[in-house]
C-alpha cells in the first residue's frame, strides 16, 4: 500500500 504509510515508520525509534 504505497498510499498509506506504515504506522511503524512514523513512530520514533527509541531503541
From Swiss-Prot:
Keyword Glycoprotein in record: yes
Residues carrying 4-hydroxyproline: 5, 7, 12
Modification note: O-linked glycan consists of a D-galactopyranosyl-backbone, 1-3 or 1-6 linked, substituted with L-arabinofuranosidase probably at the O-3 position.
Residues with attached carbohydrate: 5, 7, 12
Keywords from the UniProt entry: Glycoprotein, Hydroxylation
Annotated protein name in UniProt: Arabinogalactan peptide
Species in which this protein is naturally found: Triticum aestivum (Wheat)
Amino acid at each position: 500500500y504505497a498510499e498509506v504509510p506504515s504506522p511503524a515508520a512514523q513512530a520514533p525509534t527509541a531503541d
